[in-house]
């Protein structure tokens, strides 16, 4: 079994919570934590064995690196230190991601070294220029989307000539770069943080191809900088396969896909149901979803609304309940009004997909109080060597309150 002990950042990088373990041992620890968490709600034998991540190394399709700078001026571009939470680790390699991602990081760091006037962004005081470097990997092409996020505060704004220099450094390399974006983070008191995005080079989207192992059903997905997509392509297929098994569709179902992102789950499940309605609040993700619906010829059975989930639920609270609700919310979980809507309309089946079992546990407890029962649970690992995992739960309505 693989371990992380041959990583040069072993013991100091905060990216891996179980770096000293072999992979099978880290899975056992995750299972133990999940069983302890859900013990008040379900018997232990209802939780299926965790599905391992394959491959456990080099499988991540997205990674975000942060810029750090000490008061003394020491710079680093990488991850947060596991021993000093406010300090960064200057990453030179990472066994979880594509090797060439590190070449992009190295070139960016060299560009930064040429510009001592550019300070790392410090969120608590909204000071500094350089925020993050994000790299997405396309599949099966193995090409890259690179996103540099900088401060949009006028005092710390990076000039366009400097950004153009960074772009040309990347393009002069032999790396297979599909897209380069410059993103400015606008944060100020009294307004919600937002991002102004500019495509500097290439196509607006990067592609991911997804296939289900059971029947070969496949689709291609266009992803923009802020489109959500599962971080491991092989595990994404297993998540959707599990959702399909839990639903056990007959072909006549209406499926409501809340927090649908780029439409991945709904599009992949559309061949097995009558129609899919997706809801997503991030414009970038909805733009990707619309592209994906058209590219995969799903206009007749999949539609996506650019709307806050709670607003959608309020607008449709008197409509007929969908046969199945898919919930795949952010780590903070559902909004309370969404939960109330789900309880009010009483759909027969809910498939709750979560990257944060703690919020999932609490919201499942609320759903149980409202007449639902947990029928199946399947954890899936897609964050090797960390404490994180994806957990999929099937709930069915048994009581009309």
Swiss-Prot record:
**Which amino acids does the record list as binding S-adenosyl-L-methionine?**
230, 259, 280, 328
Alphabetical UniProt keywords: 4Fe-4S, Iron, Iron-sulfur, Metal-binding, Methyltransferase, S-adenosyl-L-methionine, Transferase
**Catalytic-site annotation from UniProt:** 355
- UniProt cross-references to SUPFAM superfamilies, sorted A to Z: S-adenosyl-L-methionine-dependent methyltransferases
Under the heading InterPro entries, the entry gives: MeTrfase_TrmA_AS, MeTrfase_TrmA_CS, SAM-dependent_MTases_sf, U5_MeTrfase_fam
Q: Does the keyword Transcription regulation apply?
A: no
Q: What is its EC number?
A: 2.1.1.-
Question: Pfam families from the entry?
Answer: tRNA_U5-meth_tr
Q: Which GO terms describe its biological process?
A: rRNA base methylation
Which family would the database say this protein is a member of? Belongs to the class I-like SAM-binding methyltransferase superfamily. RNA M5U methyltransferase family.
> What enzyme category does the UniProt record give?
transferase
**UniProt protein name:** Uncharacterized RNA methyltransferase CPn_0885/CP_0981/CPj0885/CpB0914
Q: Which domain of life is it from?
A: Bacteria
State where [4Fe-4S] cluster binds. Answer: 7, 13, 16, 94
GO terms for MF: 4 iron, 4 sulfur cluster binding; metal ion binding; rRNA (uridine-C5-)-methyltransferase activity
Keyword Iron (UniProt) = yes
